[in-house]
Structures are given as structure tokens and as C-alpha cells.
């Protein structure tokens, strides 16, 4: 049989079920958030990186044309190389059942035994792929609307079309940039099918593994430069080195930064629940002050009573764990599943590790326990005389502080409203904790809405610089007089030609940078692009040897300024350009802009272009789609090989995918904080009503009706909500700015985002907090209206 002290603990939990439910739910939300983020992060880092390393990713790759087996064998014998393989891929388009054309990149399997890196796992159908069949990477199946055994119409860049059979599926986390983000699907074909499609017999890329220090990126760069040098000595032109972060999935930095941000917010949710524990335990001690006196009078020591209430807090925490741990597992699965759709990996298990469980248990038991120590120790120090001689409700009187004296001067409100106003400030410690809870919830919500506005504004500013409706990239340079016919497409008001190159920066000792820099050769007086300048000026038509650099270049060379010279190696040619302007943006379209006529002459491409920019008369998606289709059809009729066709609307929508994902989860965390804030307010109002039982009875005795009492309680809740909104609105500005800086790291931006403080978010939170305060105050107000004079006489 339980000892009396433990029966008292159970009685306290059971006698006030609303109080118990509020505290348990509040703690559970914080523990759930911890479990969701910690568990989801564990799944992501374990399974995403595990699947990535399982395909045996290369240390680096070097692109070049006409690679043969002899060159591959030469590279395999180089010092520092553990293994190497050559790959061949072709980019084309595939038609979906709806008639849309989507990008498809096919890797040619020439020798299955020689496939050493980025090795796919067969799922269905024959492997390697048979003649006239295509084996799709699994993420391509829903993207293309394909199924095993179905026909897939593909179109090459020269306009030739072929029908292939979907022979099966494979899984390869290393096939390429995720389909959901890149809008490019991946597949595999045999050597015979490649020959049918006209794919050249050689290879166009070399992947290799270093033999030592495989996680040392600097070491990999040294070996990669040696491999590139070997390729160039063979007479081939390097298409650039690609080095990914060793040992982890390419998007690991994004995942780490994003989950860290979610983790910080989940900690706030737990912190807010701790405030409710402080309020609840403080109120419980105040209500049971006579019980404490009786226990002390019959021999209970301070430590016995402290132990009693600590066990009560532990019971709150234990009950919250029963709710939060299963929900945390579901939340972790949901968070990881969202990333599965983006990054294409397998979830091995959702069972939380001992580390995650330990974090949740510590959050559910230790944090509330620590939060309750102060009210428990201070509340149990009361003497027997003080406990039995007081009423337990005498504290919290109004009229002693400066704030109280200021409120006494308010006379223009009705008496019930004055009572609500003064009641709000009776328990200032409790009010402070409740305001802290709601204020934190509000400022996080307003900060998230501001981040959405900042990100959308940043993306909008980027696209406002682009006065182009249709982008057409060609597979090789073409003379512009062959391309001029696209101007005849109905709806086209202007046509501009660009060329794109990739170059390496040259140091004073003539060593090349490991990173390549995109160079856009544009008409200086064109209208398709309006770059915002931070320093210097934009290009002039008469400029020769001039360049405008962007954040993509200055991030690596921050000391570069207007008037400096930059040396580049482009397609084997060494060039020296003078910086005439600098444009800083978080997501620059290129590292350098140069003048098309003069630069193309330097490169031997005078009168040629690799890109076409079309400007339409009506800037809507329907017009853009029609013009893109007609222009592409016209070019193919002229024998022009089109690599990619994009419209502005589609490009902008794709750019918002990652932003919308981040904002969605930040809003989810903000909602959790708001829920904790609402529970905290409901708990505070319930405690206030309980402590004012006698006052409510007096009001009943002098004729106060149910509606009047309910209005007093709800008005008090609304006032607390309004004060928290005002405090949150003031603090939200600096928090929004700091969060803006944090998101720059999440998205690995080259420069600062445009910061926007959203007044819409402030207005939205005002509406939400008023509704939240009304709902949170309704049940306590309803309970208050049910108090009778008989209840008051029986109240202890």
C-alpha cells in the first residue's frame, strides 16, 4: 500500500485534471520538438550520408572530351590515385504521358565490370540495361510519369526522336543533383543503345579516388590539379574539376545548418514549457500552504516536503514523456521523409538511438525539475505559524508597486475592466513568466514571417534583374545569323545573344585556382539583364578587356576592387581583365560579366553565341511556354542543337522550392511555440481564477452574473496577450535580423540577403494572439462563472 505522501502526490495530479493536462502537454510539446529535430537530424546524417558513401563516390572528377581507355589507365598509374573510371553521359529530353518535355541525363554502361564509383543498386528489371531499353533511377519514375515496360519518347539536342522501353529501375543516391531540386531525371543505357542514339564512342568525364587522406579536401585538390594537368598534356581541353565535400552528402552543410536552426527553436519550446512548470508549482505551493503547515506540525522536515513536490514535478515530466516520445518518433520520421523526397535516400530505421532518447528524457525530467527548484525551495521554507496563520491567498495584493499606483490613476474604464486591468498585475512574477512565454512565441513567429518576406524579396530582386522570358541554351556555339529567325516567333519583342564560359583564376606564380568561375559574355547595351551595381559601373559597348565581377568571385578574392586586374585561364587561353564594377548578391548568375563583341573575338567566337534570351510582349506563363516551344521548334528545323529551354516562370518557381521548405518547417516550430504559449496562458488564467475563488464568490453575492464574470477573466487574458504582442513586436526586429544572418548560412549565400521586417507578420500575430488569449481564457472564465457562494464557503 502506498505511503500517505505518495497518495497525496497522486491526489494532487488527479484532483485538478486541467492543471495536470496543461503542464503535461506543455512539457510534451517541448520534448516532442526535441525528439523530432534530434531524431530527424540523426536519420538524415546517418542514412543520407550512409547511402551516399555506399555508392562509392569519387574524390573528384574532371570533364573532358574524347577520353579513351589509354588515358584512364595512365591516370590509374599516377601516384596518389587509388582508382579511376571514365564515364559517358548524354543529356536529352523525355516526354511525359501529359505531353510535357522534361530533362533526362543518361549514363552509358559500356562495361559493368568497370563501374567502380557511383555504383547503382538494381531494383527491378534486368541489369545492366538491354538494347533499346532505359533503366531509370527510381526518382525519375514519378518525375517522368513512367512505369516498367512503358514506352518513353526521348529527343536528342538535334531534334531526333527515339522510343525506348523502360526496362527497370535502380537506386543511386549519387546519380546527380536531386531530381526534386534540379528538375533533371537520371537513367542508364547500354553501349548498343548509346550507339543507336548517336552518342560518341569515347568518354567525357574521369572520376577518381585518392589513395591517401580521402577526407582531406586540400589534398584532393592537389591530386585533382595533377590529373587535370595530365589530361591537358594529352592535348585535351579540361572542362573543369568537380570536388565535393569528402565523406558526406553534398548537401550536408545545408542539412546541418537547417537542423541546428530547428534545434534552437525547439529548445525555446522546451524553455517556455519550463516557465509553465514554475507558475504551476508556485501556485500549487501557495494553495497548499496550510497543508505544508500541517505536515510540518506533525514532524515533516523541509527536505521531506521538498521531496514531495519534486516527485510531483517528476510525475509531470514522466507523463509528458509517455506522450512526447512516440510523437517525437513520428515527427522525426516526418522531418526525414520530407528530405527523402528532396534528396532521394532510404530511411533505415526510425527507432530513436539511446542518444536521442537520453536528450528527450533529460528534457522531460531534468529541465522541469531544475525549473521547479526555486519555487519549491522558497515555498517550503515557511514556518508552521506563518503557514497556519495565513490564508495562502494574501500575497499578490494590488497597490504597492509603482505600476500599481500608475494604474490607480486610470478612471476612464468601466469598473469590470478596471478590475481586469488591476488583476493582471497582482501576481507580477507569474505575469512576467507568462509574458515571457507568449512574447518568445510571438517574436519567433514574427521573425519567421519576416524571413519569408526577406527571402521572397531577395529572390524577387534577383529575378527583377532578369528582363528575359525564355532562356535557350545551345549545345555548342552557333552563328547568330542562323539564330535570327527566332525573332519571327509571334510575341517576341527582342532577342539577345550571350555566350558562357568557365575560367580559372591565375595567381602571380601562374598557378590556377581549383575552382572554376562562370563567365557570361553579354551585350553591354542589352536589355535582357539589369545588374545592380555596388561599386564602379556596368559594361560599355566600347569596353575591351573589361569585366564586372560578382560575389561568386569576391567571396574567394575579397580584396579585389574596381581598377584591379584579374587574370583568368579560359579554354586554354590566358586573359587579363580590368575590373570596372562589382555587383554583390547572395545568388549571382555568374562570377564575371564581360562585353560580348570584344570578348568573343578574344576567344575566337566572334559572331557566335551559346545562349538566346527572348523577351515577350506579354509576361505570363502561357505566353512564355508558347514562345519557348515555337522558338525551339524553329531552331531545330534549322539544325540547331538545343541543350535546355527554360521559361522565367518555371525558373522562379524552382528557385522557391528550397525557400518554401525552410519556411514551412520554421512556421511549424513557431506554431509549436504558440501552442506552448497558449497552454501557459491557460494555466495562468486557471491558477488566477482558483486563487480568486473568494473574490468571485463576493461578486456573485452582490449580483454579478455569469457574463460579467466571464468578461472580466477573458479581458484579463486579452490584456496579457496584447502586452506580449507589444513586447514581441519590439524584440522581433533584432531577432529577425539575426535569423536572417543564420539563413544566409543555411543557403550558403555568397552575400547578404535583403532584410525585410514584415509588418504583416506583426499584424498576423496580433490577430493570432487575440484569438489564442480568448480561447485560452474561455475555459477558466467558464469555470469562474460556475462558482457559487456555497463553493466559496467550502473553499479552503
Regions found by a protein language model. Give the residues of each.
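Alpha-helical transmembrane segments of integral membrane proteins
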Residues: 381-435
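Short cytosolic juxtamembrane segments of multi-pass membrane proteins
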Residues: 3, 382-400, 782-796
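C-terminal transmembrane helical bundles of large multi-pass transporters
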Residues: 601, 609-615, 627-630, 634-740, ...
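Short, strongly hydrophobic transmembrane alpha-helices
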Residues: 18-43, 314, 429-454
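Interfacial "coupling" helices/loops that link adjacent transmembrane helices in transporter permeases
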Residues: 16, 275-317, 680-722
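Juxtamembrane segments of multi-pass membrane proteins
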Residues: 60-62, 413-541, 548-552, 564, ...
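Small-residue-rich transmembrane alpha-helices
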Residues: 274, 278-281, 314-346, 355-381, ...
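Membrane transport/envelope proteins' first extracytoplasmic loop
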Residues: 2-268, 283, 302-303, 462-464, ...
Amino acid at each position: 500500500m502506498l505511503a500517505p505522501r505518495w497518495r497525496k502526490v497522486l491526489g494532487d495530479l488527479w484532483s485538478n485534471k486541467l492543471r495536470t493536462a496543461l503542464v503535461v502537454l506543455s512539457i510534451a510539446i517541448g520534448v516532442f520538438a526535441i525528439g523530432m529535430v534530434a531524431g530527424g537530424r540523426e536519420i538524415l546524417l546517418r542514412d543520407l550520408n550512409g547511402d551516399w558513401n555506399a555508392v562509392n563516390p569519387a574524390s573528384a572528377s574532371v570533364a573532358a572530351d574524347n577520353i579513351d581507355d589509354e588515358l584512364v589507365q595512365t591516370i590509374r598509374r599516377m601516384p596518389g590515385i587509388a582508382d579511376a573510371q571514365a564515364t559517358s553521359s548524354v543529356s536529352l529530353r523525355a516526354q511525359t504521358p501529359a505531353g510535357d518535355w522534361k530533362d533526362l541525363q543518361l549514363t552509358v554502361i559500356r562495361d559493368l565490370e568497370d563501374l567502380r564509383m557511383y555504383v547503382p543498386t538494381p531494383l527491378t528489371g534486368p541489369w545492366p540495361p538491354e538494347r533499346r531499353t532505359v533503366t531509370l533511377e527510381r526518382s525519375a519514375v514519378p518525375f517522368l510519369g513512367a512505369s516498367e515496360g512503358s514506352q518513353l519518347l526521348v529527343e536528342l539536342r538535334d531534334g531526333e526522336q527515339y522510343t525506348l522501353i523502360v526496362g527497370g529501375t535502380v537506386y543511386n543516391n549519387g546519380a546527380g543533383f536531386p531530381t526534386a531540386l534540379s528538375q533533371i531525371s537520371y537513367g542508364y543505357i547500354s553501349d548498343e543503345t548509346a550507339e543507336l542514339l548517336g552518342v560518341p564512342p569515347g568518354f567525357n568525364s574521369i572520376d577518381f579516388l585518392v589513395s591517401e587522406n580521402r577526407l582531406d579536401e586540400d589534398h584532393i585538390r592537389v591530386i585533382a590539379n595533377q590529373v587535370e594537368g595530365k589530361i591537358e598534356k594529352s592535348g585535351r581541353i579540361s572542362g573543369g574539376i568537380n570536388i565535393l565535400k569528402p565523406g558526406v552528402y553534398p548537401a550536408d552543410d545545408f542539412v546541418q545548418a537547417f537542423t541546428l536552426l530547428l534545434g534552437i527553436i525547439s529548445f525555446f519550446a522546451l524553455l517556455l514549457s519550463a516557465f509553465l512548470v514554475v507558475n504551476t508549482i508556485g501556485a500549487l505551493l501557495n494553495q497548499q500552504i496550510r497543508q505544508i503547515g500541517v505536515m510540518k506540525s506533525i514532524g515533516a522536515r523541509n527536505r521531506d516536503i521538498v521531496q514531495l513536490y519534486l516527485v510531483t514535478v517528476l510525475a509531470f515530466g514522466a507523463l509528458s514523456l509517455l506522450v512526447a516520445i512516440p510523437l517525437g518518433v513520428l515527427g522525426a520520421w516526418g522531418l526525414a521523409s520530407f528530405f527523402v523526397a528532396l534528396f532521394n535516400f532510404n530511411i533505415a530505421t526510425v527507432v530513436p538511438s539511446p542518444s536521442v532518447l537520453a536528450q528527450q528524457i533529460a528534457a522531460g525530467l531534468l529541465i522541469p525539475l531544475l525549473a521547479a527548484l526555486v519555487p519549491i525551495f522558497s515555498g517550503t521554507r515557511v514556518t508552521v505559524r506563518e503557514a497556519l496563520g495565513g490564508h495562502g491567498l494574501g500575497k499578490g495584493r494590488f497597490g504597492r508597486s509603482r505600476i500599481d499606483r500608475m494604474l490607480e490613476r486610470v478612471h476612464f474604464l468601466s469598473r469590470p475592466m478596471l478590475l481586469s486591468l488591476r488583476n493582471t498585475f497582482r501576481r507580477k512574477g507569474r505575469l512576467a513568466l507568462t509574458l515571457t512565454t507568449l512574447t518568445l512565441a510571438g517574436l519567433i513567429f514574427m521573425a519567421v514571417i519576416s524571413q519569408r518576406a526577406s527571402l521572397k524579396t531577395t529572390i524577387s530582386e534577383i529575378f527583377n534583374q532578369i528582363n528575359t522570358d525564355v532562356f535557350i541554351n545551345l549545345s555548342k556555339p552557333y552563328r547568330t545569323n542562323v539564330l535570327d529567325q527566332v525573332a519571327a516567333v509571334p510575341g517576341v519583342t527582342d532577342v539577345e545573344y550571350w555566350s558562357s564560359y568557365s575560367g580559372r583564376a591565375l595567381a602571380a606564380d601562374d598557378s590556377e585556382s581549383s575552382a572554376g568561375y562562370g563567365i557570361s559574355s553579354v551585350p553591354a547595351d542589352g536589355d535582357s539583364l539589369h545588374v545592380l551595381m555596388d561599386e564602379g559601373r556596368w559594361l560599355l559597348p566600347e569596353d575591351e578587356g573589361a569585366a564586372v565581377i560578382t560575389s561568386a568571385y569576391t567571396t574567394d578574392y575579397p580584396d579585389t576592387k574596381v581598377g584591379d586586374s584579374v587574370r583568368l585561364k579560359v579554354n586554354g587561353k590566358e586573359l587579363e581583365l580590368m575590373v570596372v564594377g562589382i555587383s554583390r548578391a547572395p545568388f549571382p548568375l555568374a562570377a564575371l560579366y564581360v562585353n560580348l563583341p570584344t570578348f568573343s573575338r578574344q576567344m575566337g567566337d566572334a559572331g557566335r553565341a551559346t545562349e538566346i534570351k527572348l523577351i515577350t510582349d506579354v509576361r505570363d506563363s502561357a505566353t512564355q511556354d508558347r514562345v519557348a516551344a515555337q522558338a525551339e521548334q524553329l531552331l531545330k528545323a534549322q539544325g540547331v542543337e538545343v541543350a535546355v529551354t527554360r521559361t522565367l516562370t518555371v525558373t522562379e518557381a524552382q528557385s522557391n522550392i528550397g525557400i518554401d521548405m525552410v519556411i514551412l518547417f520554421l512556421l511549424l516550430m513557431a506554431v509549436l511555440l504558440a501552442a506552448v504559449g497558449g497552454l501557459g496562458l491557460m494555466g495562468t488564467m486557471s491558477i488566477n481564477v482558483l486563487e480568486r475563488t473568494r473574490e468571485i464568490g463576493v461578486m456573485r453575492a452582490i449580483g454579478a452574473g455569469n457574463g460579467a464574470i466571464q468578461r472580466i477573466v477573458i479581458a484579463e487574458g486579452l490584456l496579457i496577450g496584447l502586452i506580449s504582442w507589444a513586447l514581441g513586436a519590439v524584440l522581433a526586429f533584432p531577432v529577425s535580423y539575426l535569423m536572417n544572418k543564420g539563413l544566409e548560412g543555411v543557403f550558403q549565400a555568397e552575400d547578404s540577403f535583403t532584410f525585410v521586417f514584415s509588418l504583416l507578420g506583426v499584424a498576423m500575430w496580433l490577430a493570432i494572439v487575440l484569438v489564442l488569449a480568448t480561447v485560452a481564457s474561455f475555459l477558466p472564465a467558464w469555470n469562474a462563472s460556475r462558482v457559487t457562494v456555497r463553493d466559496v464557503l467550502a473553499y479552503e
